[in-house]
Amino acid sequence: MLPPLPIPPDRPVLIAGPTASGKSALAAEIVGRDGGVVVNADALQVYDCWRILSARPSVAEEAALPHRLYGHVPRRGIYSAGHWLKEVEAVLREGLRPVIVGGTGLYFSSLTNGLADIPHTPPEMRHEADAFLARAGLSAMVADLDPATAGRIDLRNPARVQRAWEVLRATGRGLADWQAATGAPLLPLAETVALVLRPDRDWLAERIDRRFDLMIEAGALEEARVALADWDPALPSSRAIGAPELVAHLKGERTLDEAIAAAKLASRQYAKRQRTWFRNRMRDWREIRLP
């Protein structure tokens, strides 16, 4: 799958693409051929609980090549783009050529464009936001945002809206205002080989469905069962596609076939959002058309 373009062995490589497009295999191929370290840029693959459901590299794959930032955060832990950037900075200091791979666009934009130093909001603000969202709903929370922020974030994403609402309430400044004060990037795009995978939609949909079937065979239901006792849908780790659907099955709320169908649909919808994000935000990246 190596792209038909030169990749200097000492130059950092960035690989972005939608779920199930073959990003990890390409990263491993590059590191296996030229050396370096595979660095995770997927917000769900950082969690220790979802090796199967997040499609993390297998134990054997991680042992065969250097890997960083995979499965090192506990399921109930909070992990942000800021945490990720600090850990990537530490990886860069190791001196190995990084091949940074994943599907979380915010991580890549933070890496190559910089990340605003937005203060953490106190726990009591999170509780206030939770209560407001439950009482008034997402549309009311959106209405409270400043216009600049409302025009920049995904207003259909409750987590993004709530984060912006909390920042505005806690600091008196909108999230967009904080982001305007962004510092220098850790790894400017011009210093990298930046690749974005552009798979055919139908080809990708077939791969998504087939991969989830393989996840079920590999034990995805057992992974979800481990999380069942203290399942909290509000946790960032609970956004792993397939986890809410399988937990619903384990609670008796839907059949296994219904859960699998819902997870496949959620994966295809997520891939569509990723493709849109990459198309709009990664116009300076080199495209690799698939298949």
From Swiss-Prot:
It comes from the Bacteria. GO terms for biological process: tRNA modification. The record marks T104, R126 as: Interaction with substrate tRNA. Disulfide bonds: none annotated. The keyword Magnesium applies. GO terms for molecular function: ATP binding; tRNA dimethylallyltransferase activity. It catalyses: adenosine(37) in tRNA + dimethylallyl diphosphate = N(6)-dimethylallyladenosine(37) in tRNA + diphosphate. Belongs to the IPP transferase family. This is tRNA dimethylallyltransferase. It comes from Cereibacter sphaeroides (strain ATCC 17025 / ATH 2.4.3). The lineage of its organism: Bacteria, Pseudomonadati, Pseudomonadota, Alphaproteobacteria, Rhodobacterales.
